[in-house]
Design a protein with these regions (language model features):
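Terminal targeting signals and extreme-terminal segments of soluble enzymes
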Residues: 2-219, 232-267
Length: 267
């Protein structure tokens, strides 16, 4: 292979510095999307967040008013934001600042005008009122309820795989986060019902995600993600969800399993 003569004057370290400088200049000249809005905090005193139940944070944390306004006039938001509605808008916590490096994929990388300019979470009011009706889900034959947790997302064009098509990995991430928010809310609801201290809560971990891609999702556009807890068996939480496009057609389906950690026995 013929190496350009000017490159032979560089040592490996100098070559690395030279090429890195070129790439940095290139990246700063590209039209990288800027953040379209501020990054909210769940609380002015972030030290208090770790001492609160997740459901309490949803009930008291600030909702993104720009996203609320956007979806209040968008067809996908009308079923959930028009009175009487069984849903209440709540913070989509992955987009909120945590004063550490957690959730930076959502609250920094995806929190731009060209990626996800708007996102709004909604939860059933009966869950916030500590009446999650879990006894109705003890078997697969139980009647289906309205979604426990709904996420409305506006997706722009900087998250494409194929031209004009949203990357499937982004859809998987949105479904994973939505199911995670759903199970955290329901688990927190039970903790509050049984008057458990936040420090006593068992952590929940994703054990399995089975995603089926039914049809491509074009961009830009808005999506509706609906999630349900189907049943619970001991430490296992079985959830399902769907992701639909602007036209209401289901593009992606998911089934997930979350497992809570074993309780720690104090000796």
């Amino acid at each position: 292979m013929n190496i350009p003569r000017f490159l032979t004057r560089f040592t490996p370290n100098l070559l690395y510095k030279y090429t890195s400088k070129i790439f940095r200049k290139y990246l700063t000249r590209t039209n990288a999307p800027k953040r379209s809005k501020q990054i909210y905090k769940l609380s002015e005193n972030m030290s208090e967040v770790k001492t609160q139940h997740y459901l309490s944070l949803l009930g008291t944390g600030p909702v993104d008013n720009e996203s609320l306004s956007f979806f209040s006039s968008h067809p996908c938001g009308l079923p959930y934001l028009t009175d009487p509605s069984p849903y209440q808008p709540v913070p989509f916590t992955p987009l909120y600042e945590k004063n550490d490096t957690s959730d930076t994929f959502f609250n920094q990388t995806l929190n731009t005008a060209g990626t996800i300019p708007h996102a709004l979470a909604l939860i059933r009011r009966d869950i916030l009122e500590l009446n999650p009706r879990l006894q109705e889900r003890e078997s697969d034959s139980a009647p289906s309820l309205e979604p426990d947790f709904v996420l409305l997302v506006k997706i722009d064009t900087c998250l494409n795989g194929f031209q004009g098509t949203v990357h499937g990995g982004l859809l998987a991430s949105l479904l994973d986060e939505s199911l995670g928010c759903c199970v955290e809310a329901l688990s927190s609801c039970l903790d509050l019902v049984h008057q458990r201290h936040p420090g006593e809560r068992a952590r929940l971990y994703t054990a399995n995600l089975n995603i089926s891609y039914r049809a491509p999702l074009t961009s830009p556009g808005a999506v509706t993600i609906k999630t349900w807890l189907k049943r619970r068996e001991g430490r296992k939480w079985f959830l399902e969800g769907t992701l639909s496009g602007d036209d209401g057609r289901v593009r992606t389906e998911v089934k997930g399993l979350w497992i809570s950690e074993r309780s720690k026995t104090v000796l």
